[in-house]
Amino acid sequence: MPKRTDIKSILILGAGPIVIGQACEFDYSGAQACKALREEGYRVILVNSNPATIMTDPEMADATYIEPIHWEVVRKIIEKERPDAVLPTMGGQTALNCALELERQGVLEEFGVTMIGATADAIDKAEDRRRFDIAMKKIGLDTARSGIAHTMEEALAVAADVGFPCIIRPSFTMGGTGGGIAYNREEFEEICERGLDLSPTNELLIDESLIGWKEYEMEVVRDKNDNCIIVCSIENFDAMGIHTGDSITVAPAQTLTDKEYQIMRNASMAVLREIGVETGGSNVQFAVNPKNGRLIVIEMNPRVSRSSALASKATGFPIAKVAAKLAVGYTLDELMNDITGGRTPASFEPSIDYVVTKIPRFNFEKFAGANDRLTTQMKSVGEVMAIGRTQQESLQKALRGLEVGATGFDPKVSLDDPEALTKIRRELKDAGADRIWYIADAFRAGLSVDGVFNLTNIDRWFLVQIEELVRLEEKVTEVGITGLNADFLRQLKRKGFADARLAKLAGVREGEIRKLRDQYDLHPVYKRVDTCAAEFATDTAYMYSTYEDECEANPSVDRDKIMVLGGGPNRIGQGIEFDYCCVHASLALREDGYETIMVNCNPETVSTDYDTSDRLYFEPVTLEDVLEIVRIEKPKGVIVQYGGQTPLKLARALEAAGVPVIGTSPDAIDRAEDRERFQHAVDRLKLKQPANATVTAIEQAVEKAKEIGYPLVVRPSYVLGGRAMEIVYDEADLRRYFQTAVSVSNDAPVLLDRFLDDAVEVDVDAICDGEMVLIGGIMEHIEQAGVHSGDSACSLPAYTLSQEIQDVMRQQVQKLAFELQVRGLMNVQFAVKDNEVYLIEVNPRAARTVPFVSKATGVPLAKVAARVMAGKSLTEQGVTQEIIPPYYSVKEVVLPFNKFPGVDPLLGPEMRSTGEVMGVGRTFAEAFAKAQLGSNSTMKKQGRALLSVREGDKERVVDLAAKLLKQGFELDATHGTAIVLGEAGINPRLVNKVHEGRPHIQDRIKNGEYTYIINTTAGRRAIEDSRVIRRSALQYKVHYDTTLNGGFATTMALNADATEKVTSVQEMHAQIKKS
């Protein structure tokens, strides 16, 4: 059946901001869907509130709306654009929930819009736990014993039937949000209370515990003629009880017999038929009891998912693209496989002759007090994938690609420690983020495979692989570098050992191992991912390294090549924004006739799509792996400034090895990052900085602090995302910081800066080509200095700064760009206090604000800068004017505190946001209101507000209180704040702090008395005391601000209607051209 002709235009729903459980894999699927549908001649309308995505680039769709994914806003878009169909399967849970809401509210019917890709009934049948259970029974498949509850009474009744331990999951949430495992009644009640609150339908599913069972996933694609193919089988290395997003996973499944695999394959196809997924991809999850082989279906997702992104990258089969085409009526046999150049149809099941391992990346160090044990609720923030010819090779490559300081199975405990065994046993039984390394330690400490299995329930086959690697490591330590003959070294490299790991074991430097390999002429070869296990030829250059005989890389010799180094796994502080820049570099240079080479190991991203670049190397971004690729490709230039800290920290070593790093030189990057060298540059330019000092010892710090004056910002040098950065208010605080946090920097000094309280922070993105400086955009932060720039909302153009102040900044940026000899992108941060401009820092690289600025101004900064790096000046490109748009754009961040119940949700100098949204409006207020709606804020227009502010905010709080009263709010205040308001003639109701007797603040929040809370604090003691206010506000879904500026912005936004007007990016950019 060829494509449908009754449909002319299609609305694609995006996934919105990146949160834990829903990351950039949906940018990858959405971007593929846009391409696939436009190829077929459809008009594509896209809505997604996240500006840091490739899919929201103006070229990707015919009309792009960076608007909140909220049914009322989408209704406006449908009314304006009149699409014939809506495709909800590309934007994760957000898009499915929005589509169901549009259906429920009658919007689809009102405007005659058809849902394609999945029906509302199929989505509901897969997501509604009771309907799903009935459907599975109908086709003879087993599901876990379970019950459904809508209240605590019902929940306790189910628990009596299912027994403890049991697993609790709220309906219609993603990444296991709000779920957990309860071992007793107390834990059960706590999880249920939270889960009922978080489920949009107030529904919980309570299951018998399957902890310790083996977990598998099948990625299935089905078309409307009932052709079904399995794209990939995935096995979870970690047993049931750990969310699949937090498990190490392997493809293809390794420990199934052929018979078991066929049973599972047939079952997964039966599931799709019964649920009614007629077109597109789904993932079906199974659990197998290793004791008796009982197979049960856990769940299915009737959409493109995190696993399908992994399956696409693991096999080269573009699930999202195929799903989009099936949704408009094609069948699998009509679609051709790109990778084999159309030699095979898409109805051929991919077969693979390699092993793929995915390992999740965690960021618990950002969340003091978080429970860091892995459960059924997802907590990882990113993932890394590696490809090898054996399980061992692929696992070790993934470990070093993870960038957590490990080059392989580095030990976690010292075996001399008398507590070592106790610690190992505890870590194996109750898994945290590092369990894989503790397994290796267990073998070093003498545990047997059975002993480890009994603690972990990880299949013995995987454990034997790790045990063998540990034994090989012991042998390397024993024979040393002289014992590494050509055969032994080759054997080690085939098992995935990194040079750096072997060097550590042999007690030499990494360079020595590389020298030895050169002597033996021992280098990796590159194999291609071709979907067909080399049965057909492929022209697609999608490669991975391995130590075998035949190399399939076949690099071109006559073309100018540029290599872009990606950012590796997502983590807080280095996310999709950097991937966005890498993709733009590749696209721009391809347009200019260069052959582009991408090196990255993150399976969720657009950069690792096989058609983003001419050649893709799916490899860890480490010195060894990059040098080997450079050796065979011989690029004319390598770009390290776009992937965040990952490639940046390789810059000097690459340069030393003779690699042509283009753009800003590694030395210039060092001049900006090294405090002392930077100081010289600033002094020479006579720019103002906050008083500061660099110290290497605690007593020296105490002395310097007295000179500078408190409060201070303290941090180690060279960090991204503000790791181990804190504001200290007195000497006791400073001493505590040195004792607990400073081990972060290996002999690197610690920086002390005077903290500018109440200053306005400003971010400026710019491009320099050596002759001129282009200002990309000046962003004024809404939260004051002291809140990490990555966690602060910001406005472009600035909404309070005077023209003069902005001009001073423009001049300073220009001076700095020339002084540091920047070629390409740079980002400068300023603080403005009492009309004085202070320079905070300069980053001569792509910053996380680049995508936002590009969307707001219509200038693709990352593309322009990539061309500058390749030698094309700004004048030649015709991009010389700073664009100041005739409307406001506001970026707001999304924070993951709901996943970490123990953590204080106070904003500070340590970055913790996972994603961002953008709001656009004619006024600042309208733009801010849209950004709030897009970030799922629960702000109400009226009600009762609670004010509790620190000493320094007391004079300004009167103005805020007056604004809230005018808006119709009733006011409550804590003692100190109430006195100040009373003196100004405003009389709030007085409320007790928690230690002042009941009813206190927490009681009132629990009773739902407040619709808005503003709570600002200073000093460790006050922060500890008021933490309960912030946690309760979060728990009971009350909108709260922890800065006064945030409060003023919120009250401004109350008068704007975020759902009234929708504007496409294309219309915005046309307005700029007019003005």
UniProtKB/Swiss-Prot annotation:
Q: How is the cofactor bound?
A: Binds 4 Mg(2+) or Mn(2+) ions per subunit.
Q: Which residues bind Mn(2+) 2?
A: 299, 301
Residues binding Mg(2+) 2, per UniProt:
299, 301
Enumerate the residue ranges of region (Carbamoyl phosphate synthetic domain): 554-936
Give the cofactors, semicolon-separated: Mg(2+); Mn(2+)
- Residues that, per the record, bind Mg(2+) 1: 285, 299
Q: Where is this region: Oligomerization domain?
A: 404-553
Describe the reaction catalysed, as an equation. Answer: hydrogencarbonate + L-glutamine + 2 ATP + H2O = carbamoyl phosphate + L-glutamate + 2 ADP + phosphate + 2 H(+)
Q: What is this protein identified as?
A: Carbamoyl phosphate synthase large chain
Q: What is the lineage of its organism?
A: Bacteria, Pseudomonadati, Pseudomonadota, Gammaproteobacteria, Enterobacterales
- Coding gene? carB
